[in-house]
Amino acid sequence: MRKFETLLLLSPELSPDAREALLVKLVSIIEKNKGQFTVNHWGMRDLAYPVQKHMRGYYVLLEYTTYPNIIEELERIIRITNGIFKFMTIKLEEHIEEKQLEEVV
């Protein structure tokens, strides 16, 4: 299993219940494949430019461990789900040392 992060930009028009239902749908894919996850709600933020004619969006960060082949299915579901404006998934390093972080900064 590997560690991943997916940042989601959701429509500001989604109700809190609709947001939770959407996240439950995504998290169930991870859980079904024996992955572990955390969900961080960053909340409503102003956007630097309009996205689908909206100047605000709701950000959610999913941090999880799963098998790499599950990412394809997760991203497929994200692409066809209404209410998700944008997303980005990245693979995290297994062990990041402080020295490596200093080199990046």
UniProtKB/Swiss-Prot annotation:
InterPro entries assigned: Ribosomal_bS6 (IPR000529), Ribosomal_bS6_sf (IPR035980), Ribosomal_S6_plastid/chlpt (IPR020814), Transl_elong_EF1B/ribsomal_bS6 (IPR014717)
Q: Which UniProt keywords apply?
A: Ribonucleoprotein, Ribosomal protein, RNA-binding, rRNA-binding
* GO annotation (BP), single: translation
Query: What is the protein named?
Result: Small ribosomal subunit protein bS6
Q: Enumerate the GO terms in the molecular function aspect.
A: small ribosomal subunit rRNA binding; structural constituent of ribosome
Per the record, the domain of life is Bacteria
What is the protein's species of origin?
A: Lawsonia intracellularis (strain PHE/MN1-00)
Q: What does this protein do?
A: Binds together with bS18 to 16S ribosomal RNA.
What protein family does this chain belong to? Answer: Belongs to the bacterial ribosomal protein bS6 family.
Q: Which CDD domains match?
A: bS6
User: Gene Ontology cellular component?
Assistant: cytoplasm; ribonucleoprotein complex; ribosome
Gene3D superfamilies per the UniProt record, alphabetical: 3.30.70.60
> Does the keyword section mention Methyltransferase?
no
Pfam families the UniProt entry points to: Ribosomal_S6
